[in-house]
Amino acid sequence: MTILVLGGAGYIGSHTVYALIEKGVDVVVIDNLETGHIEAVHEKARFYKGDIRDRAFVDSVLDHENIDSVVHF
């Protein structure tokens, strides 16, 4: 299973990413890093820097990744 975490570089999002990865889940993170920090993103997560309001950007991530579920922070 692959879960997309929107806002996965923020405090709550990054902790969620760590918990998911510890459970063996494949994680993809999108964050614009306005309030999040790249250092907070788990090294096993695939990270995309961008704004979720940019439909073309989000579509490109969804085209590239096989996402089963989304968590939005």
Predicted feature locations:
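N-terminal Rossmann-like NAD(P)+-binding domain of SDR-like oxidoreductases, especially those catalyzing
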Residues: 1-73
